[in-house]
């Protein structure tokens, strides 16, 4: 009976998630490119591959800065400051195999390029049809591919087919975020239903793909969904009660300036909810597995619950400080600035930038802690009747 109730609840929630996704499905209409991301013609910035040929110190202000070179770079007029002039080979695009020269002042925030470095350079065409180049970013494609490949190989080597299914689940999660969540938020949809629908869809895919379809995983999924709803309510309460606006972050200010129909507090709320997914999933799956393993010993439901909660408390203790330290690590530059600002500890902790991280940690920690008894109770109810049907001598 308990199994039928849990399966029925998961089916009903799944149908509700599907209906919500259809109702909230984004328009995917093309939007204007924000000004900072436009090229001179109003389109997207075009980048090309390049690599550094040489670098030298020379007077700033060369007329050849950024131009496609047909000869040696022109020298700057005398009397200016000193810059680093870097000769770049253009490796893609209409000027492939040509060279350009880029100047850098060498101050804070300026890139430090060495001979052989592979970079991305933006290509601009002015009203007169002349092409110019500027430094855009370092080329990171192959290092990232290498790390991703090693990550995938290690996961599959250790976890085998379950690891492969987990990797597929990660791909599904990113597809949901890119195809549904981000466009829906960009359309101005309400953050809570969008984030809940996206998160629930990710959980169904990730848990069942990685761990298979069983009563054990169904218990973990139902516990995670319950904790996720709790996290959404806590996130809303934290943002409202603490008057968090999200405008202390530069990216949110850019969103407010260039995507006026997007709610910044809604975006903050969605971030809180999505951020709680991973840690909740980890804890609930572990708890459900613990309960079903304890049930194999023939213990009673109460003993199983108590034993699993001992394991769960250890998991909570280790995961909570991991959660807090992860958020503290992401805010480390901000904390460093506050450390030299000669402000009181109370002012620092209640400033919006730090308060957001505190609220995020608190929401995740509360949802994490409460997910343990919820999942343990659900799994204990499911595991003990299942065991008794195979163990007629069990009391």
Model-derived features with residue positions:
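Helical hairpin unit composed of two closely spaced alpha helices linked by a short loop
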Residues: 277, 282-285, 291-342, 346
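Structural detector for short beta-strands of small beta-barrel domains
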Residues: 43-82, 119
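Extended, hydrophilic extramembrane loops/domains of integral membrane proteins
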Residues: 105-140
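Hydrophobic alpha-helical transmembrane segments of membrane transport and translocation systems
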Residues: 328, 332-395
């Amino acid at each position: 009976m308990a199994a039928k109730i849990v399966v029925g609840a998961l089916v009903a929630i799944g149908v509700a998630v599907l209906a919500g996704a259809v109702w909230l499905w984004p328009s995917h209409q093309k939007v204007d490119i924000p000004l900072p991301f436009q090229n001179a013609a109003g389109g997207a910035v075009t980048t090309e591959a390049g690599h550094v040929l040489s670098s030298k110190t020379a007077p700033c202000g060369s007329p050849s800065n950024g131009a496609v070179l047909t000869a040696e770079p022109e020298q700057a007029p005398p009397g200016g400051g000193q810059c680093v002039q870097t000769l770049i080979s253009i490796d893609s695009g209409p000027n492939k195999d040509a060279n350009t020269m880029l100047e850098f002042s060498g101050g804070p925030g300026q890139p430090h390029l060495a001979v052989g470095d592979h970079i991305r350079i933006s290509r601009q065409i002015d009203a007169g049809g002349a092409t110019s180049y500027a430094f855009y970013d370092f080329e990171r494609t192959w290092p990232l591919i290498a790390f991703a490949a090693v990550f995938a190989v290690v996961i599959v080597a250790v976890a085998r087919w379950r690891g492969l299914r987990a990797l597929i689940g990660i791909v599904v999660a990113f597809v949901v975020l890119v195809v549904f969540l981000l466009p829906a938020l960009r359309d101005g949809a309400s953050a809570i239903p969008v984030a809940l629908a996206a998160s629930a869809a990710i959980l169904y895919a990730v848990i069942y793909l990685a761990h298979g379809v069983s009563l054990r995983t169904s218990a973990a999924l139902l516990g995670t969904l319950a904790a996720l709803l709790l996290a959404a309510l806590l996130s809303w309460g934290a943002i409202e009660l603490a008057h968090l606006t999200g405008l202390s972050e530069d990216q949110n200010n850019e969103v407010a300036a260039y995507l006026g129909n997007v709610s910044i507090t809604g975006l903050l709320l969605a971030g809180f909810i999505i951020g709680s997914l991973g840690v909740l999933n980890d804890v609930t799956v572990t708890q459900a597995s613990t309960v079903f393993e304890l049930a194999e010993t023939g213990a009673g439901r109460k003993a199983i619950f108590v034993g699993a909660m001992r394991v769960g408390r250890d998991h909570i203790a280790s995961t909570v400080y991991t959660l807090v330290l992860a958020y503290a690590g992401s805010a480390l530059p901000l904390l460093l600035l506050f450390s030299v600002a000669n402000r009181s500890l109370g002012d620092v902790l209640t400033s919006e930038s730090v308060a957001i991280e505190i609220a995020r940690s608190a929401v995740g920690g509360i949802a994490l802690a409460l997910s343990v008894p919820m999942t343990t109770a659900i799994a204990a109810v499911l595991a003990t009747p299942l065991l008794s049907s195979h163990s007629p001598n069990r009391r």
